[in-house]
Amino acid sequence: MLAIAAVCGVGAFFYFHSDFSWDSDASDDANGPIANMDQTLPQTVLVSLDNRWVDLSKSKGQVMLLEFFATWCPGCVDETPSLIRIQRKFSNRGFTVIAIAIDDQGEETVESFVKNRQFSLDGASAPLNYPVLMGSVEIAQKLGFEGGLPAGVLVNRDGKEVKIIRGVVSEATLTKTIQRLLEN
């Protein structure tokens, strides 16, 4: 009973203290909500698994999905085939998925996961087709992460963070949301 009260209390806190509004197209999606947000992408420089420095704020002109994940997160692993398909579908239209590992297991674990993991994709096996950067919970919070994995932030062509994704969202909903951003 105490646990139920605690969950209700936390939920009420986030409901009444949220700076976000629910996206009407995603609010009925049983897989998870997409919320509106409006903040400029802060200057953030992260290192990729191939030791390149990537300044996220220099990606204006691109629509980006900053996907926060960890190797131990089942939802993160489950949604990866959808992200691979979305990257394939929209990469030639100025869109990219950028995975940001906030894994407490370290860079070696993340690198092994990315290099050795094959994802089932339409009856075949496929590797990741988007960059993976090393981050931390603190960096993710600076970028709009509120906690809970999987999670993501959609950034428009002007470098504004416009949507936050909490939990696993259906591929169809995410595709529709990205398509709208690409058309604006």
Task: List PLM regions with ranges.
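N-terminal targeting signals for export/organelle localization
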Residues: 1-43, 163-164, 184
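A short beta-strand-turn-helix
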Residues: 43-64, 87-90
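Short pre-active-site segment immediately N-terminal to redox-active cysteine/selenocysteine motifs
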Residues: 62-64, 68-72, 148
